[in-house]
From Swiss-Prot:
The gene is cyaY. SUPFAM superfamilies: Frataxin/Nqo15-like. Involved in iron-sulfur (Fe-S) cluster assembly. May act as a regulator of Fe-S biogenesis. This is Iron-sulfur cluster assembly protein CyaY. GO terms for biological process: iron-sulfur cluster assembly.
Length: 108
């Protein structure tokens, strides 16, 4: 992977995450600045997706902890670097925990 491809992949996944939240009907605020997507839930908790270009990783900070994701070229998914869990599953779980709603993240 090169840096251009990495940034394109992260831009695309952040847009997919924004779209899923927009479609969810949850009362939240989304801010995407400097390559960092911040989701602020009504209760004040946050979910943060940030890019780590030197490592070609996507990092997620949630109430339950910090998670590092690598892009899997074979499946076309971002997967947790230790458990191999897809990004969408972690986002679903974190959103349920922090926002109280079951939001699907198709294709993630």
């Amino acid at each position: 992977m090169n840096e251009v491809r990495f940034h394109d992949l992260v831009d695309a996944v952040q847009q997919q995450v924004e779209d899923a939240f927009d479609d969810s009907g949850l009362d939240l605020d989304l801010e995407n600045a400097g390559g960092v997507l911040t989701v602020r839930f009504e209760n004040g908790s946050q979910l943060i997706l940030s890019r780590q270009a030197p490592l070609y990783q996507l990092w997620v900070a949630a109430k339950s902890g910090g998670f590092h994701f690598d892009y899997d070229e074979t499946s076309g998914l971002w997967r947790h670097d230790a458990s191999r869990e897809p990004l969408g599953a972690l986002l679903n779980r974190a959103t349920l925990e922090q926002g109280g709603e079951d939001v699907e993240f198709p294709g993630l």
